[in-house]
Amino acid sequence: YTIQEEGPKDGPDMLRILEPNDRLPGFRNRYFIWRYDLQTGLYEQLTYGHNNTFINDVSADSRYLLFSTSEQDYTSLPHSSNSMYKLDLQSMAVDTLWEKAQYINGATFSPDGKQLMVFGSGNAFDNIGLNIKEGQISNTYDGQLFLYDPATRKAKALTKDFNPNVTSAQWSKFDGQIYMLTEDQDYQRIYTCNPVNGKIRRLDLPEDVIYNYSLAETAPVMYYYGQSVSNANRLYSYNTKNNKTQLIYDLSADKLKDIKFGEVHDWNFTSTDGTVIQGRYYLPPNFDASRKYPMIVYYYGGTSPTNRALEFSYSMHMYAALGYVVYTLNPSGTTGFGQEFAARHVNAWGDKTADEIIQGTEQ
């Protein structure tokens, strides 16, 4: 676990700003890793120093701790670096796996502790996972997955040619597969990746947007929950061996009792540069095709896709219930459509995005 230590304070007469983030509360505080022995009751501090230390993982046999530090570097992209260390909790020997590496977000142990599953962007490990056009700058919000061998210090890209954005992953102890939660266009889906041959397979699961999942360690069982374009959350169990799904609890049936929604239709168009832009529209309940309705166009100005979830801050059905047709789309620069598509967001300043939104609205 980690404990926060309060950092040094400036005197009352003068403030020294060490860097831009020093203006934020708590910037000088530091987090360090401690261990508590349940048998002896001993508290022991494992890390200290100038930088924060973060727990990444503990090996299955509890012998090794994987922890990292990060440092700011405003002279080059992505303006931060990551160092990863493997601590032997018996001998207290530290193995430095990499220092001041860029574009790496974190790592976890494989079930046998011999490899690492590393999260980062395509630029990590000297660009081995990069898949963009010449002249583009990668979108670091587009997550990629790597295998790293601590013995050889070599890494392998697992998702270089995989379009969905990997947001999280778990390495199953039971079947040895890596289960990845992804942004897959306007869906959130779970895929498996075979770490031996790199083969990726999508799990055929109910619900458009899966929020979270949990894997059993000693059985072919996964629990997950999610929702879709016109229903709230439902909880399921999934057998990873025979691929069968069972509904455990339908929260949506309780929450949406006596609520009527309008229809939702997918609608894509091809922009002037030949790009297919994905979108959908929502109709009011009791929609009358002979009438004219005002239309609301919703788009997110960031880089994440507007997914198919029913419940979020700007629910499309809520606006449709007020008598509007609601159109939403995922223009160039959105994650979940491949690295090249996501990279269009960088230094674009909305020019291409605005054109596509206008084109879709007019069509």
Language-model features, listed with the residues they occupy:
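Beta-strand C-termini and the immediately following turn/loop, strongest in propeller blades
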Residues: 21-27, 47, 66-78, 98, ...
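Predominantly a core beta-strand signature of beta-propeller blades
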Residues: 42-45, 92-95, 154-157, 199-202, ...
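Predominantly five- to eight-bladed beta-propeller fold
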Residues: 1-39, 81-82, 122-146, 235, ...
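Blade-terminus and WD-like Trp-Asp/Gly-His loop motifs, strongest in beta-propeller folds
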Residues: 56-64, 107-115, 169-177, 214-221, ...
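Short loop/turn segments that connect beta-strands within beta-propeller blades
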Residues: 37-41, 88-92, 149-153, 194-198, ...
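Serine-hydrolase catalytic core recognition
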Residues: 212-363
